[in-house]
Design a protein with these regions (language model features):
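N-terminal accessory regions of nucleic-acid-interacting proteins
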Residues: 1-43, 47
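Sterically constrained small-residue positions within well-ordered secondary structures
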Residues: 36, 53-55, 114
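An N-terminal structural lobe/cap that precedes and organizes the functional/catalytic core
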Residues: 48-67
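Short, glycine/acidic-rich hinge or "gate" loops at secondary-structure transitions
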Residues: 191-198
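A common structural microfeature
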Residues: 40-44, 59-61, 70-71
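Short, flexible, glycine/charge-rich loop motifs used to bind or transfer phosphoryl groups or to couple energy/partner
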Residues: 32-34, 52, 87-89
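Active-site-proximal helix-loop-helix substrate-binding element of RNase H-like nuclease domains
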Residues: 5-22, 63-92, 96-179, 183-186, ...
């Protein structure tokens, strides 16, 4: 894995395209879907919850990025209450691979909304298969890109509205580099002869999103 960075990592402070606002209106949602449909390549995605503050496992924020569309932050609660059709999102991204980190935490919430990835690339699963000693997103990003991500809002109450700018920045950064990571990790999986094994793991995770609902997973080493 030739992209290992031994120098001091630099802190990624903001997404290259700036800090996006939260989309909470149907009109804004339509614009996001149109942009995603016009974009290309894999879809980087993530979700934030408020499990320590509210009962249940609802997603209170969905982050996504696709080449040509930039980063979008969606308020799934407000959009659902306004009558958003999540099939519009599914159709916009089509057969694109969804890049998630620790997909077992995010797929159940996506399934609850009706979001249906057709293909998956999980950077945490890939990191484990590649033998990385630390496989949290911050550690994987540092390993491959020499970049570190701030994690100070990981346990925040994501049901809070309006979301402060630094929270939105944190959320956007979680998907900022996933596309780059997918490209590099796919290369290393092929080189290690583990690409087919990885696809089997991704397919299994994608086919069993509800099975892990409510299970307690140990935190990924950062």
């Amino acid at each position: 894995m030739s992209d290992v960075h031994d120098t001091e990592p630099r802190l990624l402070k903001e997404p290259r395209g700036g800090v996006p606002d939260v989309t909470s209106t149907i009109e804004g949602y339509h614009h996001v879907c149109e942009a995603l449909a016009d974009a290309s390549g894999s879809l980087a995605a993530d979700a934030e919850r408020a499990s320590g503050f509210r009962y249940g496992h609802e997603d209170w924020l969905i982050q996504c990025k696709r080449e040509g569309a930039g980063i979008a932050l969606l308020d799934p609660i407000a959009l659902t209450q306004s009558g958003a059709d999540w099939n519009e999102f599914n159709e916009a991204v089509g057969d694109a691979t969804w890049i998630l980190h620790d997909s077992l935490m995010d797929l159940p919430g996506f399934a609850d909304l009706g979001l249906q990835p057709k293909a998956l690339f999980d950077t945490e699963i890939a990191a484990r298969l590649l033998g990385l000693h630390r496989f949290g997103l911050a550690a994987v990003t540092e390993h491959y890109l020499g970049i570190t991500l701030a994690k100070e809002h990981s346990a925040a109450d994501w049901s809070y509205r309006p979301l402060p700018r630094d929270w939105r920045n944190y959320a956007a950064l979680d998907v900022e580099v996933l596309i780059e990571l997918e490209n590099l990790m796919r290369r290393d999986l092929r080189a290690a002869g583990k690409d087919e094994w990885a696809e089997e793991e991704f397919t299994h995770a994608l086919a069993n999103p509800i099975r892990f609902r409510g299970c307690a997973f140990p935190a990924s080493p950062s």
